[in-house]
Amino acid sequence: MSNKAILCVDDERTVLLGLRDQIAKHFGDRYRYETAESVDEAWEVIEELSEDGIENFIIVSDWLMPGVRGDEFLIQIHQQFPKIVTVMLTGHVDEAAIERVRRSANLHAYLAKPWSEDHLISVIRSGLRRFDDENSNPVHR
């Protein structure tokens, strides 16, 4: 099993399955794919991934969800797991939220709904390259 995972978080099941299916179609069985319909469920999945020894993963999270918004969630993620690559997805452009996540959560990319499959795959590919770059260029102390 891969030591890398891609977690998609969105309260709309059709969006969630569309994301997962498009990503899995392009990357096959090289990665573990997870979905969550809420921030609470996402935290459970993250805990499960950590227990399985998976530390390199990408989170694609919707911005507007019930309870905790995606920008707040990604900031919390970055505070606890700074190496996780974060991508925010939204149909409602909130430039202030995007900028806040860029500054506070090292946002890798922002995708507008509806997204193009090519752009989604390009964003995921570049996020995965960040893991490869970190592993091939270790910091010497």
Task: Give the location of each predicted region.
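Receiver (REC) domain active-site loop signature in two-component systems and cognate sites
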Residues: M65
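Acidic, metal-coordinating helix/loop segments flanking the phosphotransfer/catalytic sites
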Residues: T35-I58
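C-terminal output helix
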Residues: W115-S126
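The C-terminal output helix
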Residues: R125-H140
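Hydrophobic/aromatic residues positioned on beta-strands within the core alpha/beta folds
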Residues: L89-T90
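Conserved acidic segment of CheY-like receiver
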Residues: N3-I23, I59, L120
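Short amphipathic alpha-helix used as the core "switch/output" element in two-component signaling
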Residues: E44, D71-K83
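Alpha4 helix (beta4-alpha4-beta5 surface) of REC/receiver domains from two-component response regulators
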Residues: E72, V93-Y110
